[in-house]
Amino acid sequence: MEEPSGAQLLGPVEIRALAEKLDVTPTKKLGQNFVHDPNTVRRIVAAAELTPDDHVVEVGPGLGSLTLALVESAASVTAVEIDPRLAAELPETFQWRAPALAHKLSIVLKDALKVQQSDMAVQPTALVANLPYNVSVPVLLHMMEEFPTINKVLVMVQAEVADRLAADPGSKIYGVPSVKASFYGPVTRAGSIGKNVFWPAPKIESGLVKIVREDTAWKQDDETRKKVWPIIDAAFLQRRKTLRAALSGHYGSGQAAEEALRAADIDPTLRGEKLDVTDYVRLAGVLQQKDEK
């Protein structure tokens, strides 16, 4: 039966049939778990809050479960797929399940960590994806870095990764991913996804993470990241250490680290987990001012 909006979403029977046709066995190496529940797919698209003007990039479309639903809500969808078999089959699936919407689909056959602006016919305004679990955080951060046009994100990741990304300063699970993701705007949990909507069913549950890119007091460019990222990395490398000790290598000595921290109005005896992204950006700014003198 055709979906009211013009696409027939994939259920368990269609997913298994496609996998058998392509001789595809989901692999841990590529972090593959295929969603076979249409209601879950609809829920993800609804949580993304897309508009008809949005150009979506989807990383790891797999057999096309989410892709079919995305084209209904957006102006276009660019699917980034590393597996040649899956990439080649996706247009066929659209001719079968959503022929009237096939013109909205573009495919980039590439590792998502190597995708560049030049790969895209249209620069994306939204990232919506069931991210490959083994590289979810690096892919998320790369896409935010490479495509400043992305202003909204809704991704599905492992539940514990979702918790880390959305963690607040001071939390035991607050860390490098939390700070770097919040560099672009507020990061929130947008729901949980059970194991049984996937094939094969993973051992752990999944979570939805939402990011809304905001205009920040700092530039979200490579130059700023190159100053801020190393400080974040150093602060959490030995998270039990005080910032004075943790950043001594970065600044050349404990004394230099303490001076920079005090100049940024940060207590040197605090640990890295107590600072938010604004603190880290401010600290990087102190170093920049020092370099400019």
UniProtKB/Swiss-Prot annotation:
<protein>
    <recommendedName>
        <fullName>Ribosomal RNA small subunit methyltransferase A</fullName>
        <ecNumber>2.1.1.182</ecNumber>
    </recommendedName>
</protein>
<feature type="binding site">
    <location>
        <position position="60"/>
    </location>
    <ligand>
        <name>S-adenosyl-L-methionine</name>
    </ligand>
</feature>
<dbReference type="InterPro" id="IPR001737">
    <property type="entry name" value="KsgA/Erm"/>
</dbReference>
<feature type="binding site">
    <location>
        <position position="33"/>
    </location>
    <ligand>
        <name>S-adenosyl-L-methionine</name>
    </ligand>
</feature>
<dbReference type="GO" id="GO:0003723">
    <property type="term" value="F:RNA binding"/>
</dbReference>
<keyword id="KW-0694">RNA-binding</keyword>
<keyword id="KW-0698">rRNA processing</keyword>
<dbReference type="InterPro" id="IPR023165">
    <property type="entry name" value="rRNA_Ade_diMease-like_C"/>
</dbReference>
<comment type="similarity">
    <text>Belongs to the class I-like SAM-binding methyltransferase superfamily. rRNA adenine N(6)-methyltransferase family. RsmA subfamily.</text>
</comment>
<keyword id="KW-0963">Cytoplasm</keyword>
<dbReference type="GO" id="GO:0052908">
    <property type="term" value="F:16S rRNA (adenine(1518)-N(6)/adenine(1519)-N(6))-dimethyltransferase activity"/>
</dbReference>
<feature type="binding site">
    <location>
        <position position="111"/>
    </location>
    <ligand>
        <name>S-adenosyl-L-methionine</name>
    </ligand>
</feature>
<feature type="binding site">
    <location>
        <position position="35"/>
    </location>
    <ligand>
        <name>S-adenosyl-L-methionine</name>
    </ligand>
</feature>
<keyword id="KW-0949">S-adenosyl-L-methionine</keyword>
<keyword id="KW-0489">Methyltransferase</keyword>
<comment type="function">
    <text>Specifically dimethylates two adjacent adenosines (A1518 and A1519) in the loop of a conserved hairpin near the 3'-end of 16S rRNA in the 30S particle. May play a critical role in biogenesis of 30S subunits.</text>
</comment>
<dbReference type="InterPro" id="IPR020596">
    <property type="entry name" value="rRNA_Ade_Mease_Trfase_CS"/>
</dbReference>
<keyword id="KW-0808">Transferase</keyword>
<feature type="binding site">
    <location>
        <position position="81"/>
    </location>
    <ligand>
        <name>S-adenosyl-L-methionine</name>
    </ligand>
</feature>
<dbReference type="InterPro" id="IPR020598">
    <property type="entry name" value="rRNA_Ade_methylase_Trfase_N"/>
</dbReference>
<dbReference type="InterPro" id="IPR011530">
    <property type="entry name" value="rRNA_adenine_dimethylase"/>
</dbReference>
<feature type="binding site">
    <location>
        <position position="130"/>
    </location>
    <ligand>
        <name>S-adenosyl-L-methionine</name>
    </ligand>
</feature>
<dbReference type="GO" id="GO:0005829">
    <property type="term" value="C:cytosol"/>
</dbReference>
<dbReference type="InterPro" id="IPR029063">
    <property type="entry name" value="SAM-dependent_MTases_sf"/>
</dbReference>
<dbReference type="Pfam" id="PF00398">
    <property type="entry name" value="RrnaAD"/>
</dbReference>
